[in-house]
A protein has these predicted regions:
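GIY-YIG nuclease catalytic motif and its immediate N-terminal context
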Residues: 1-43, 49-52, 59-71, 76-88
């Protein structure tokens, strides 16, 4: 399984979109400053998660989210029924 995720940094007031097969490890790396793009925004909070069977499917979804470049669209996605965090 591959997960597309959205992180939010209150400190930086911005979102980060990514995909990984190891979500917990990836989130730890983001919060330890292991990614140059997210380093300045720690701590990051996981606000959206959606799982896919293949890397190809996940990459398509990630690209669609990243290309949106519309904050309102990203917020709607976070609050949508596709967000697997809502079912926990």
């Amino acid at each position: 399984m591959v997960t597309v995720y959205i992180l939010y940094s209150k400190k930086a007031d911005r979102y980060y979109i990514g995909q990984t097969s190891e979500l917990e490890n990836r989130l730890r790396r983001h919060n330890r400053g292991g990614s140059s793009y997210t380093k300045s925004g720690t701590p990051w909070k996981l606000v959206y998660r959606e799982k896919f069977e293949t890397r190809s499917e996940a990459m398509k979804r990630e690209k669609k989210l990243k290309n949106a470049k519309n904050l309102e669209y990203i917020k709607r996605v976070i609050h949508s029924s596709r967000n697997e965090l809502k079912s926990e």
